[in-house]
Amino acid sequence: MRLLHTIIVALACLGIQPAAAQEAQPFRILFDWGKPELTRDAEATLREVTADFRRSQPAQVDIAGHSDRSGPAGVNLAASRRRAEAAKSFLIAQGIPADRIAVAAFGESRPFVPTEDGVREAQNRRVEIRFMR
């Protein structure tokens, strides 16, 4: 079941989803280079996520972690996972039930801004959060 959930999250992040699912515009938070810690701006955005969650009561919150291409692929994948987990922990602390949150990590495989290998691109060090209805 968890694998199926991860696959659904991955497909949603690619813009592919079941016809019954309705997806709102994603929230996007950025991270400093080499850091999984949430910035003040990220925390403010996650508070918006929490408020929207309470208003709209989506079935699920999908969190997708990403990284830039400034390090080895394995390190970047781990960094994207830590960033996604940081966002999840914050949302849980704000009262969103853990069982309504799914996390996926994509490392450097889905850049927001295409770059060459080794490039530090702030927009690629991100977490995207979507509601699934």
Regions found by a protein language model. Give the residues of each.
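Sec/Tat signal peptide C-region and signal peptidase I cleavage site
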Residues: 17-21
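Solvent-exposed, flexible loop/coil residues
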Residues: 5, 33-35, 42, 110, ...
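Envelope-exposed proteins and targeting segments
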Residues: 25-27, 34, 57-59, 97-99, ...
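Periplasmic OmpA-like peptidoglycan-binding domain that tethers envelope proteins to the cell wall
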Residues: 66-133
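Bacterial N-terminal signal peptides that target proteins for export
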Residues: 1-8, 14
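A short small-residue
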Residues: 26-30, 65-69
